Amino acid sequence: MNINPINLIPANELGKDSKIKLSVCDTEHDLYWRMAIEVLETIKANNEKGEDTIMVVPYGPLGPYSRLVYLVNTYRVSLKRCTFINMDEYLNDDCTYIDKNDPLSFRGGMERIFYNLVDDELNVLPENRHFPVPGEEHKVMELIEKAGKLDMAWGGVGINGHFAFNEPPEPGESCTAEEFLNRPTRVLPISRETKTINCFMNCGGDLEAIPKYCITVGMKEMFMAKKIRMCMPRDWNAGALRKILHGGETPAVPCSLFARHPDAMIYCSRVATESPVPEIRIYNK
């Protein structure tokens, strides 16, 4: 059996000598609290300075949002000066948005899990809730340039190491790290790996239920953020975690390129630090 040496690194040595910081949380729930608290603290600090907050945010993982709602409503932290740019959305075959009422829609999902639950007097103003729009991809950069900053980009990491839907180059596709990091907000096909894990997580394994296309905020815009925060809460994140931290900088594992960012950190659960050495796993023993 050919085992990648990085998969043999003991869990307590992960992140050593990596330019990307690692914060290991005991459980998935602890991770969600830490992420929510950092988002809240960033907003609160800007509020106290009389400054606006602008973030690129995900739809997933969902866990931080319920905790952020609780923190905002309990401690009365205003989001009125926030601009949230969601990082991606699914598209139809004609590269238009899927219906907002589709269970898979991130636009509809953000309303259900976050915007509809924050107290009105504290909520992000409707005009400051953004998604990248097919045909108007340039507007994401315009929002960031108008704000003069991007406080944070945070979100989950895909099974192939992607961030948002910044998918790795396809086999045989030539792309340098510099070229990949210069890719802006755009429409693109969803990779087979992403379709597979997303249908496993959300559609009972029905591959055909996952759309073929998406729109994503690009790595070009992500790198403008003061802080990059990646969330890896699941056991299936274990392989990508090690590649990101110890596999070298490569577009084949997009998040590995955040080693070039001055403030990039991964929040992971302890289960994600386990070695991904192959074994036959028996579920529901």
Listing of model-derived features with the role each one plays in the protein:
Residues 44-76:
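Glycine-rich N-terminal segment of FAD-binding domains in flavoprotein oxidoreductases
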Residues 55-64, 159-162, 235-237:
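Gly/Ser/Thr-rich loops at beta-strand to alpha-helix junctions
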